[in-house]
Amino acid sequence: MGGMQTLQWAIAHPDRVGSYIALACCARHQAQTIAFNDTGRQAIISDPSWLQGHYPDGKQPAQGLSVARMMAHITYLSETGMEAKFGRKRRDTVAREPFENYDVEFEVESYLRHQGQAFVSRFDANTYLCLTKALDRFDLYGTLGTLDEALHHVNSPGLVVGFTSDWLYPPQGNRDIVEALLRLGKDASYVELEMDAGHDSFLLCSPRLEALIRSY
């Protein structure tokens, strides 16, 4: 969302944006991303505690929000990163009947459940619904079907950074933005960093990313 806001500010307020850096973003969500977001929304809406969004304070649809966050968190990672961190490591090495219960068995299950439960304590379900829908509806292509019409308003120099393992916002989507800016004669640069943390790569304290931002 931050990268999308950055681009929108550069378009809507060209006289107020001196320069910008957009990390791991896109001009609009593709079908797969919308599908993930809607599945998360359905987890919330299907929770009996949602009550059409009119749940009382302190009694939000915690289970639905937790599941939505678990699934979304998977999209922030990468297959390589998850395999390196978790693989098939188990929390419990005691032999058990395979279908006697569905408690946490693998480390990755424990990690995702923790992420979901922790999210519930600091985030609101209705807010999650609104934010994911806003992300899905964001579209720089607009009704004309091209980026050029929107990006021709940009007057400031910009840097767009993509990450090789980001499958939520793949590098090609970042490149498309810069290619459109260059077609319009704008001052734009693109850098693609090879990192295995998926979309979350932009959150890591990477010396390469820090050096890139500082130099820009």
Please annotate each region the language model reported:
Residues 143-148, 170-181:
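Short alpha-helix in the alpha/beta-hydrolase fold that links the catalytic acid
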Residues 3-14, 20:
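Short glycine-enriched nucleophile-adjacent loop
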Residues 16, 22-118:
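Alpha/beta-hydrolase-fold enzymes
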Residues 114-115, 130-150:
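Active-site nucleophile elbow and catalytic-triad environment of alpha/beta-hydrolase enzymes
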Residues 175-216:
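Catalytic active-site module of serine/aspartate enzymes centered on a nucleophile-bearing elbow/loop
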Residues 154, 160-162:
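Short beta-strand/loop motif that positions the catalytic acidic residue
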Residues 118, 135-139, 164-169:
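Acidic catalytic loop of the alpha/beta-hydrolase fold
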Residues 151-155, 182-184:
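Short, conserved loop/helix-junction motifs that constitute active-site signature segments
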